[in-house]
């Protein structure tokens, strides 16, 4: 499966910071994601290059914290 480039856009910068901490903790528990996922952030956007972008969307939607975000597949 080819990797997809996605961009997560958050409405507030502190939301990106809160999300990043939780998401990267989750990634560290799922080592296969870390190997298959490259990421960086610019302003309120988190750019991810991954095989598993649908899993990222599911993770965000199933999290107890609700984030004001959208995903764009690049």
Regions found by a protein language model. Give the residues of each.
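Conserved short beta-strand edge segments in small beta-sheet-based binding/regulatory domains
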Residues: 32-37, 63-74
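A structural detector for beta-sheet-dominated domains
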Residues: 9-11, 49-51, 72
């Amino acid at each position: 499966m080819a990797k997809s480039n996605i961009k997560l856009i958050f409405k507030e910068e502190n939301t990106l910071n809160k999300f990043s901490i939780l998401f990267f903790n989750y990634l560290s528990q799922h080592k296969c994601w870390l190997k298959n996922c490259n990421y960086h952030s610019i302003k309120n956007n988190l750019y991810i290059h991954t095989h598993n972008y649908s899993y990222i969307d599911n993770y965000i939607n199933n999290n107890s914290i609700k984030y004001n975000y959208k995903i764009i597949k690049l």
